[in-house]
Amino acid sequence: AKGAYGEGDKFVGIPVPKTRSVAKQYVYVAPEDVLPLLSDAVHECRLLALLIWVAQFPKSDKLRRKRIFDLYLSNTDKINNWDLVDLSAYQIVGEYLRDKDHTPLYRLAESGYLWEQRISIVATWKYIREKQFEDTLYLADKLLQHPHDLIQKAVGWMLREVGKRDKA
């Protein structure tokens, strides 16, 4: 089904650490130049595109960070597997919104699209690490009854991360 879990994914078996080391070599390419990789049917190509953005993000100025964030959110249809979300959402979406209005997180959670919903909750891992739990708890409450196990697992994971840090 269109937009379904791993729809049309082809795996070639490249380990994540290898993909990550390749990504670091392309930290200075224009963010737009990785879009063909993000559109590829091969899962590891899409992962490489996202890991390039993840590697670029901390080295980027405000303008470039906004471009990466905007490209990420306008291509969520290609970020369609749990590992693609989990290895990128908090480092791009979470980091970008850290000192901004978090409304985009709530829009993603309400989108009805599985992967955008997972992006919304996983992005809050950035804030959990800084002992800011409000967004996570709000989104967890909204998504807790989600019918898909991939959302339930992400919510459980983030709540567990909150529990590790909130000893109150």
Regions found by a protein language model. Give the residues of each.
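Alpha-helical scaffold domains
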Residues: 1-168
